[in-house]
From Swiss-Prot:
This is Protein-export protein SecB. It is found in: Cytoplasm. SUPFAM superfamilies: SecB-like (SSF54611). Gene3D superfamilies: SecB-like (3.10.420.10). Disulfide bonds: none annotated. Belongs to the SecB family. Keywords: Chaperone, Cytoplasm, Protein transport, Translocation, Transport. The keyword Protein transport applies. It comes from Rickettsia bellii (strain OSU 85-389). The keyword Nucleotide-binding does not apply. Its main location: cytoplasm.
Amino acid sequence: MSTINTDANEAMPHISVNAQYIKDLSLENPDAPSSLAALEHRPQIDLSLDINITNLSEENFYEVELNIEAVARNEKYKLFQVELKYAGVFNLINIAPEQHQILLSVHCPAMIFPFARKIIASCTQDAGFQPLMIDPIDFGALYHKKMSEHQN
C-alpha cells in the first residue's frame, strides 16, 4: 500500500483548471445554399486570435479567454464567418507572482486551445463545409512577439 504525502503535493507549484466554457459563439453562413455549391477550390481563410486575461476576485484565480474569428472566402462568396469566445478559469497554486503573466499568456491558452479548435471544426462542418482545422498555435512565440512590441 502506498502513502501519498498530501502536504508535499499541496506545496508543489501547479495550475488547476477550475472550469472551461463557451462565452459566445456565432456562425454566419450568409450565402447558403449557393456558397455550398461553389466549393471548387480551397477557400481563403482569414484568422484572428486574441487573448484576454482577467484577474477574478479570488486570489490567484484568473479567467483566460481566447477570442478566435475565422472568415472563409472564395472568389464569389463570403462562405462563413465563425467567432468564438472560449474561456477557462485557472488557479495558480504556489506559483510566484512574477511567473503569472507568462503562464496565463502561454500555458493556459495552450491548455484550452484544443477544445476551442474542436468547437470551430464542428461548427463549420455543421454549416455544410469541411471542418476548419486550425493549425496549432505557438502561444510562446505570440507572447514574446507581443512583449517585444511593448518594449519598442
